[in-house]
Amino acid sequence: LYACNERIMSDRDELIVGVLNLAKASDAVLLAGNLIDNAKAQAEADVEVKAAAAEADFRRINGLGPKDRIPPKLRGAYNAIAKKDELKRQATRLTRDVLDRALNSVASIYRDVAVLQNNAEDAVGLINLENRSSIAELSVRLDRAAAVRRLEDIATARRRLNGNGNPTLVFEALFCALIP
């Protein structure tokens, strides 16, 4: 997914750097806001692309061109494709997926910290190689218990998100907990 979508990769890189640069609660709140906004925008864009593709498929299957009027007999089925309620539900689901992916990205930072703390880089390598120096600094500042505690904080955030917690509050709380 990251390899084929430049924006998703850019958002991930921005998130990783943002987490590594957390220094105060205001940083955490701003980072959470940016993450939520990016997740919603990404989800809405994906839903629009899928809806447009579904409409094009519907027209093609029914022998209609892009500019042809939809016959009255087919309007109900055509309108069901792009119902606002359904699109909103899909966008919400996709937003949750994007946020879950963000949690995986944040967890990868602390996985890399643990790898460096345990001198296992040669054996398993780092996920976030482009941020190696910042992760190395973080691995020195945190003890092993603190790194594990942050992974537990990420798991707690995931449970809260899966339990329909407010995404903004979940990520603000998480990012505040991650401040070294």
Please identify what each model-predicted range represents:
Residues 1-105, 115-180:
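Charged, glycine-rich active-site and insertion segments that engage polyanionic ligands
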